[in-house]
Design a protein with these regions (language model features):
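Bulky hydrophobic segments
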Residues: 1-64, 68, 72-129
Length: 129
């Protein structure tokens, strides 16, 4: 459905795209293959979301705006990681950023999948198990 798409250039998952770039840069994956791989992923992401909804906190399809924002976030994360990884304080900052992004992903996954969370809202403000 067109109205159910994510039309935002940047959202909380932009952190996750940036953090993935940090991990790849720290793993010594060269910039061009990493960035091209991410563009390729963005091209198939919606299809993967449709087939494997359980691992996505938000399985709505992305509009072109969001794909562009994800690519920008990834590239910015890679460039920032390259610059910051040269110093111990930079490495600490990058580690914290990756941990924050992982927390965002896990928190949203727990919030959107009732099979992970024993507590569910009933729609009346009450919570049931």
């Amino acid at each position: 459905m067109a109205n159910d798409q994510n039309y935002h250039y940047f959202d909380r998952y932009s952190l996750v795209h940036g953090a993935l770039a940090v991990v790849l840069q720290a793993s010594k994956v060269p910039a061009v293959p990493a960035m091209l791989g991410h563009v390729a992923f963005e091209m198939v992401e919606d299809g993967v979301k449709r087939k494997v909804k359980s691992i996505w906190p938000d399985s709505r399809p992305d509009a072109i705006q969001n794909h562009v924002g994800d690519i920008v976030s990834f590239n910015a994360g890679y460039v920032a990681s390259h610059a910051l990884s040269k110093s111990p304080p930079g490495k600490v900052a990058l580690t914290g950023f990756v941990m924050l992004a992982a927390g965002v992903w896990i928190w949203n996954l727990l919030q959107h999948h009732s099979w992970l969370s024993p507590l569910q809202e009933t729609g009346t403000g009450a919570i049931r198990r």
